[in-house]
């Protein structure tokens, strides 16, 4: 009988040891991090519009009328929004921002060294043809479900007029020649 109790105690002790080892192998600490965001955007900006390039091409100084505000080289461009839901927000407005011209704060100025003097970039709303000043929201666009495309134009704009010289001598040209680079960002405001 003592031998049987010893066997049972040894067997039970071994089983208990195995059970404790199994339990301690399953007990492991870990961590799960959940991230995300909640926004009130009605749409997402199309990936092709996150970093967009618009080539205004080459124009001649003579393509500009000799008045401040004269434009040349108008080029259309678009901003597309996708995955739109107009369930709560029905309209959107676009605001362009960037380095303002020192001559006219409503015009996008040149960036970088050795830029052409006397010109800037003017953005117009293609729906109306009206100038869209920097840091000023466009009129509202009505959002449609899924995809929306908003059309604009960009053009060179004269900021300095030519001056006439005295005594028949040539005057000073208001526009220089060379490379043009300007950078604008845009914000979409949902209403």
Question: Where are the model-predicted features located?
Answer:
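Mature extracellular/passenger domains of Gram-negative fimbrial/pilin and adhesin proteins
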Residues: 2-8, 23-191
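C-terminal segment of classical bacterial N-terminal signal peptides
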Residues: 15-25
